[in-house]
């Protein structure tokens, strides 16, 4: 098993900070329409996944009886 030393962990954290800074400097704020579209799509997908989970749970509970 490979054990990380304190030096390696600090290097990893520094590299992560640099990567995050680079990502934030390139990222841009979405406009209102794009943001609303993303919110609606996310909520729709969550509802579909929840509905599928409910149907699976209902089906398995009916089969087990």
From Swiss-Prot:
Gene Ontology cellular component annotations, sorted alphabetically: plasma membrane
Family label: Belongs to the SecE/SEC61-gamma family.
Gene: secE
General function of this protein: Essential subunit of the Sec protein translocation channel SecYEG. Clamps together the 2 halves of SecY. May contact the channel plug during translocation.
Principal subcellular localisation of the protein: membrane
A Gene Ontology molecular function term of the record: protein transmembrane transporter activity
Record localization: Cell membrane
One record GO biological process: protein secretion
PROSITE patterns for this protein: SECE_SEC61G (PS01067)
Keyword Cell membrane: yes
Keywords, ordered alphabetically: Cell membrane, Membrane, Protein transport, Translocation, Transmembrane, Transmembrane helix, Transport
Subunit structure, interactors included: Component of the Sec protein translocase complex. Heterotrimer consisting of SecY (alpha), SecG (beta) and SecE (gamma) subunits. The heterotrimers can form oligomers, although 1 heterotrimer is thought to be able to translocate proteins. Interacts with the ribosome. May interact with SecDF, and other proteins may be involved.
Chain segments annotated as transmembrane: 44-64
Name under which the protein is recorded: Protein translocase subunit SecE
Topological type in the membrane: Single-pass membrane protein
Native species: Sulfolobus acidocaldarius (strain ATCC 33909 / DSM 639 / JCM 8929 / NBRC 15157 / NCIMB 11770)
């Amino acid at each position: 098993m490979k054990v990380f030393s304190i030096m390696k962990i600090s290097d990893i954290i520094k590299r992560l900070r640099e990567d995050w800074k680079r990502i934030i400097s390139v990222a841009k704020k979405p406009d209102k329409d794009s943001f609303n579209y993303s919110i609606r799509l996310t909520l729709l997908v969550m509802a579909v996944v929840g509905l599928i989970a409910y149907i699976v749970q209902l089906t398995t509970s009916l089969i087990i009886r």
